[in-house]
Amino acid sequence: DYYHKQNLLKSDLLYKYLDSSEGFYQNMTNPKNRSRTNINFLVDNSQDISKEFVEKAKQNGIIGLEHHPFDPLKGCRVSLYNSINLEDIDSLINFMNLFKGVISTRSPRAFD
């Protein structure tokens, strides 16, 4: 059905970005066991940078990226519920790309 196809597209798009990020965004789940609804990742192999990522995302209007409070050591989580559309995933990936560049160069004004 429509929502199933949309969820496949959204999760495929995000997993492809994570997998192509040269290890900056790390999803530790075996590809054959990956969820289509909740996608976990760690940012730059660091809890501190993952927290910074979540805060900067909030400042840029992207919310709900915190991991489950019972397991915060896993970094970030994107929940791809039906209300999230492909444009939302594109916006998230654009932000992730910007954040990766900022952290790589530590350009302090990139988010201004």
Model-derived features: positions:
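Structural signature of PLP-dependent enzymes
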Residues: D1-D12
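Short, hydrophobic alpha-helical segments
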Residues: K100-I103
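Short Gly/Ser/Thr- and charged-rich N-terminal loops/segments
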Residues: P108
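Conserved C-terminal alpha-helix-loop-beta "cap" of PLP-dependent enzymes
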Residues: D19, G23-S91
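Short amphipathic C-terminal alpha-helix that caps PH/PH-like domains
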Residues: L92-N97
